[in-house]
């Protein structure tokens, strides 16, 4: 916690990164560290305007005998170094050495002819909102810094590295489920529910109960509850969250149920109730800081999210102490549609989200807003989805509506495959919403696939098109096909398959599903053919079984290994994606066939479902992370479709009916 020592650490690391990369370009170069320039010798000087600030703006300033890389703070120096390396041709497309793409060796340094200045308007941060205590990776964090990202969850094993890289660490989240667990024992020996049933929210319908206590937001108007929560918050901040720079303070994830008691209703809507509580927290934390009970400043990140009934802007002014403290809001459109622009008034999903975000921005004065995107929300289960079609437009909308930061759930720790493009685009757009998406994508494909970039462009375009309706297929809430299937008992349906207004009818769903599947299968075929061509390229295969001895040989071997890695990882991910989406389509079609009494067609579809089930059972799709305990989970692919139990119910129905194809 010594800012000047931290600055020296980060700037020293920047110097080492610069030297390491330059030596890979010019192995015979003599590069040394000095404390001052030597007359007549080319030098790259690293300078921070402030040793006590972590400002990430930077400038590359040509000098008579070299270059000055100047940062507003220590992080700006680091980002300036990476900007200079990008000028040389370096790219970091995914974590680890497999994602490092170097320039041709021996080409000499490219010095900027004119001054380069850059700064991001995303001052709240750019990064990932993560799940799971075990989700940490040094390679990922280094990739983030190299791509100018600076927000991640606090994790103990990589905490020092995050400090060095200038990454802002967050903790907390939906914290009150544990703090207000009804069966939590109190010092008196009674459970929290038995001691304080009045603390739990009054539901709109029916009585309170221990079993349903956490399905309604707690009663923020209870005079004894707020002090209890304040002390719990302080205990966590001074305990397990002590190293975090910011704390996510989010309500119960109840999806739409707020306390309806008279005093809570008098506070305003659900958002007003949240802000009332947060204001008390802020006042308490400020007093604790002044009294020495809290030993460091900490920001609160509140949330605008329909799961906590806080999506809509407040009806009353925002408390001044939240504004004064620099606390901010995370805007979380979890069920947004990717087939339409975020601001498309014709989209039943996005219309409400865009209106609410605009409403937050129109409040004066208002809390700064960070947008939380959902490119890998838990319902998507690491499917090979691409969002290039929507990202450029949406980031422009976010900027116009005042967004000052960007994060997304949940970045995969491994197996990026083609999703590396989403991560690269997200990093570039989070820094600069005006970034040239077409140029970035073209460069990405060229560097990742070399001579095969043209083939892979068609693969990426097909996957992108197939991803557009993913919200209608698999989103949270009961409008998606997945939710409809999960609520089905597996028997003969009593009503037609319900689809959202994007599909409109089961017949339109059927047509759209077959088109989506055709796109994925075509992409899969091209991937297989490309990988086969690479494997049969004998010119790239060495037979002398010796280590490469010169830079050209080393580069050739590295490029060949990187290409194989990229294609093989793409293939594995797309096999899983195609299997999953085909299973979903066939399940929806099977439902419709049963409802229509078309038992022969249902039998044919059931055989296909059975085949897909067996295939998905045979391979793993890692990784997921437990949010409840220290667990790392590698589920089979069938489990990750979230249809295992639905298929089991369907099978039971068929067996009970004594249908001859019940066992295939």
Language-model regions: role of each:
Residues 29-56, 159, 163-165:
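Short, well-ordered secondary-structure micro-motifs within conserved domains or adaptor modules
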Residues 1-9, 214-215:
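Acidic/histidine-rich, surface-exposed loop or edge segments in extracytoplasmic proteins
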Residues 225, 235, 240, 348-454, ...:
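Structured mid-domain segments that build the active-site/substrate or prosthetic-cofactor binding neighborhood
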Residues 167-176, 191-198, 267-281, 319-340, ...:
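Acidic, His- and aromatic-enriched active-site or binding-groove loops in soluble protein domains
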Residues 402, 428-664:
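Catalytic domains of carbohydrate-active enzymes that cleave complex glycans
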Residues 278-313, 369-376, 408-409:
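Aromatic-lined carbohydrate-recognition surfaces of secreted/lumenal glycan-active proteins
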Residues 301-334, 382-389, 415-422, 580:
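Substrate-binding cleft/loops of secretory-pathway carbohydrate-active enzymes
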Residues 13-17, 21, 60-246, 250-269, ...:
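Feature activates predominantly on carbohydrate-active enzymes
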